[in-house]
Every structure is written in C-alpha cells, then in structure tokens.
Regions:
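N-terminally biased helix-coil "hinge/interface" segments that flank
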Residues: 1-534
Length: 536
C-alpha cells in the first residue's frame, strides 16, 4: 500500500534494566500491531535490540521500507553514571582563578583526569574580563592528544567565545570529543552545575558512540533504512547523531518514554490529568500528566548525586521493582532493594533444570520436597510439613549466581502472578518462612505489603504538592500493585498494553525543535546583535 505521506509504521524500543520491550505501531490506524518483551542482557544492549527488531519486523510483509523510524529509549546513560562507568575527561577552566571555591566544588563533584586553569572569561553582561590564553590550551592539547576534553568558561552562557576558541584549538591538535559547557547550559547560569553537566556528557560519549554504531548495524541487518531516533529526558525525539554528541540528554530517556506511553494508552480511559506509575523489574518511576501534557521539573534531571542542567520531566525514581532483592528476617523485618536480582522462580527456566530438581536443591530434602510444593501451591497459610527445615536447605548456591527472593516470588506464592515457575517461588517462600518462624504464605504476604507500602509512601511524597489524583499503573507488575492498592482510597487504572508502555511512548513520540535567540550587547561599539542557537 503506497501512502502519500510515506511509511506507515514506527518501531518503539524501550531498553530497561530488566526487560527490553518493543512495539510495532501503525501511525495511520493509530494502533499497536505487535509487541515483544525480551530479557535485557547488560553485556550487550544491542543484542536485546537485535532480538526485538527480529520479532517486530517479522510482522511486516515487505522488507522494512514501510518503517518510518526506529525510536529508542534507554537507561544506558543512567546506568553508566550510577555505576561509575563513564570515561575520564580532561577539564579546562577558563577565567576561574578568582573563584577557588567554585573550582573546589567542581573538582569534588567529578574528579577529572587533569585540570588546566586558563586566563580569560567574561562578566555577567558578556563582556570579556580577561584576554583568553590560547597558547596554554594548545600546549595542554598536545600533551593529551587523542583524549577527551571538557571546556568551561566563566559566564559562557552570556558569551561563549572563549569556550569556542578553546574547542577549535583542541580539535586542531588531535583531541577526542570536546564538550563546551555553554552547549548544555540552556542559557542558564550556574558554574558548577553547568561544568558538571558538560563533564558527564563527555564521559558518556564513547559509550554512546558504540551503542549507536551497534544499533545502526542491527537496523541494516533487518533492511531498515529509516532514521534511528532516541528519546531525550524531556520526551522529545532526537537523531542518533545528536545523541552521539549529547548523550547526557538521554539520562531520563526510559522514564520519559514510560510517561509518554502512559499518557497515550490512558487516553482511551478518558483521563487527562493523573499520576503515572511505571513499575518495572528494577525500579519504579512516578510522573504526572496535567491536561494531557507531562509536567516538567524546574531543577533539571538529577541522577545519583549529580544535579544537571538537562531539561527533564518531573519524575521520581525509586529502587523498587518486581526483581528487587528482598532480605527477610521476620514479617516485621523486611528489606526490599535497592539491588536488583533474578527471581528464584526463573532458576529452572534459566538453568534448563526441572522445577522439582530446583525445589529439592533449594530445600535440601529430596524425599519431601514434592509435598512442600503441593502444600504451598494450594494457597494454604499452613505448610504441610511442620518439622524444621533441614540444615542443608540453603539459597546460597543460587544467590551466588545472581538469584534471590524477590517481590515477584512473593506475588507468585500469593497467586497474584505467574512468572517463571510459581512452584519454585512457593518452595522458596516456605523456606524463608520457616527460617523466620512463620508460614510461607504469610511471609509472602508480608513482603507484598512491604512493597505496596514503599510504593504508597513514594506516591504520597510525589503528590504532596498537588493532592490526590487518579493513578495509571503501567509496567509488568502493574496489575499486582493495583490489586494490592485496591482499598477504595485511590482511583487506579491499568490500561491496555500496560506492560509495554515505555515502548509505546518511544513509538508515538515526536521531534521537537527549540531555538533560543540571545540579544548580545557589543561593548566595543555599543551595538546589539542577535545570536540564534538550536537547542533541540
């Protein structure tokens, strides 16, 4: 079918910490044609995207020419910063000699490879305070040829000329990527936040380049010649080449996609103002939709201890998900998260073993493991066996391989979900319960109550300024948490396609072009000139 406006499909892919979700979206009929959910492999994000594209393109009759765009939201930038996996960068500070306290704050926040303090900088009016020293920058560049650089000049949002001059010198002398702080300041002042933002951006560039190159190769593999776009923290799409230059803008890409997706799929529920709650395997993101539009943050995106100047939606992220590692010492002593692990219910599927074999291994009682499984399977709070758990029962073997008891195992035990093999979850709940002096079902129920309490507390904190609002829950465990919260106090909706909301958000997002025009005063002849900058 030839359409006058070109290809009819968008592909949206949301690479999360636990799963990679994908959808094939029909832009003409405004519907989801196909969806897919694949476990994320942290060693190779591109592999998860490859598997997603393979499944989605199988739903298209032609060779991919009907796909207009592949839109990707990803937590790669976020995870790299949280895990300290960014590349080190050299830092050039221009005109900061008079402000040692600012330099100290900057160095304390980011720990650059090396620092060069250069004469120069401007005043708050954009007037040159000192003459720029190009020779010092040139010598520094030659000493660090091929390395990454971040350049920050005093009051560069008012006048970026010294930063621009330094960047030209660095590139002319064989440097790697160079980020100037004014490029990510959005015309706002704050020397520390501006410099930290630029430095973090530089540290992410090598990772972004590898990811973009890998994704480009994967797209070609499936005959996709369309653009590959990325979702920014403000939920706007940008070309991959923009992401290559400014990967820091993608730090809230995943939550932005979820919020955009929740807004889109909740439209059919006639909701235009609500709190969107995306509950994943690793974390939960809470955002707000007001009159059909996402609410923005005044402070900018914050990741870990880093406060940046990147425009972002007003999102609260908490370390709570279906796969959060759960430690239990008793029904009143439960710790959920912040670490993520693989639920025990996945052990049989991942290892290729029979569920009964895993249960015997977990409980250390091969003659009676089958009876335990049946006891817990019927939902009874009292297990069939009443004797002590054998001393050989231990989860240590599986924990060493990255597995542990999680809220998902608790939900399986309560028969609120059926993830992996629920029999294994019930056996693990039995084991945990016996060690805590309670029944396995009661133990699971206590974990579920704790998880729900953590979510409720965070939502209450987030909505403290705007009051009670309807809620839209999305993400794989959305239905479970909606049922746990079904007490009549909050209006909770779980819309269709709730489990792939992030991918839907990526698929339906659009390009936005923003320009800022600065009126610059020339102190040499008292004239004024305009300077237009594309910022997105």
């Amino acid at each position: 079918m030839d359409l006058p406006f070109g290809p009819r499909y968008n592909i949206g892919i949301d690479v999360g910490g636990t799963n990679t979700d994908g959808v094939l979206y029909d832009c003409v009929d405004k519907r989801i044609v196909a969806s897919v959910k694949i476990p994320t492999e942290h060693a190779s994000y591109a592999k998860a995207i490859d598997n997603s594209l393979k499944a989605l393109t199988a739903s298209i009759d032609d060779n991919g020419s009907e796909v207009a765009s592949v839109n990707i939201s990803t937590t790669v930038s976020t995870n790299a910063l949280l895990e300290g996996k960014g590349e080190p960068s050299n830092l050039i500070l221009i005109g900061f000699d008079r402000y040692p306290h600012i330099v100290s704050d900057i160095e304390g926040a980011i720990g650059p490879s090396s620092v060069l303090k250069v004469r120069g900088g401007h005043t708050g009016w954009g007037k040159e305070r000192e003459t720029f020293d190009p020779r010092a920058v040139e010598n520094f560049a030659k000493d660090h040829r091929g390395e990454l650089f971040t350049v920050s000049s005093m009051y560069s949002p008012r006048n970026p000329r010294h930063e621009t001059a330094a960047k030209e010198i660095l590139l002319a002398n064989g440097s790697g990527h160079v980020t100037c702080s004014h490029e990510l300041s959005y015309s706002r002042l704050n020397s520390v936040k501006r410099t930290v933002t630029a430095y973090l951006n530089t540290s992410l560039v090598p990772l972004a380049e590898r990811l973009i190159d890998d994704i480009g190769s994967v797209a070609k593999k499936y005959g996709l010649s369309c653009p590959v776009m990325f979702l920014r923290s403000d939920s706007a799409l940008v070309p991959s080449e923009w992401c290559r230059r400014f990967p820091i803008e993608m730090i809230y890409s995943g939550p932005a996609a979820s919020l955009r997706g929740a807004c889109h799929i909740a439209g059919g529920e006639s909701l235009d103002s609500f709190v969107a709650v995306d509950i994943g395997g690793t974390s939960t993101d809470i955002g707000r939709i007001y009159l059909g539009r996402a609410v923005f943050s005044d402070a900018g995106a914050k990741i870990g201890s880093y406060q940046t100047m990147i425009p972002s939606l007003n999102i609260m992220s908490i370390a709570l998900g279906g796969d959060s590692r759960t430690e239990v010492c008793g029904t009143e002593d439960i710790r959920i998260g912040p670490e993520r692990s693989v639920p025990l219910c996945m052990t049989a599927q991942d290892s290729g073993l029979q569920a009964e074999t895993v249960i015997k291994d977990l409980l250390g009682c091969p003659d009676e493991a089958e009876g335990i499984g049946r006891s817990e399977a019927d939902g009874s709070p009292k297990p069939l066996m009443t004797d002590d758990v054998p001393r050989t029962a231990d989860l240590g073997k599986w924990m060493a391989m990255g597995y542990s008891y999680t809220p998902t195992d608790a939900f399986n035990t309560m028969e609120l979900s059926e993830v992996g093999d629920p029999k294994i979850s019930k056996a693990a709940s039995y084991l945990k319960g016996k060690k805590a002096g309670t029944a396995g079902y009661d133990l699971a129920e206590a974990v579920a109550v704790k998880a729900h309490s953590m979510l409720e507390s965070s939502i209450s904190e987030y909505t403290s300024a705007c009051g009670q609002l309807p809620r839209v829950y999305v993400g794989t465990p959305a239905k479970v948490f909606a049922k746990l919260g079904d007490n009549g106090e909050a209006e909770i909706t779980v819309p269709r396609n709730f489990d792939v909301a992030g991918a839907v958000g990526a698929a339906v997002s659009s390009i936005e072009l923003n320009c800022r025009v600065s009126i610059m005063h020339s102190f040499s002849d008292e004239s004024f000139r305009s300077e237009e900058r594309r910022v997105g």
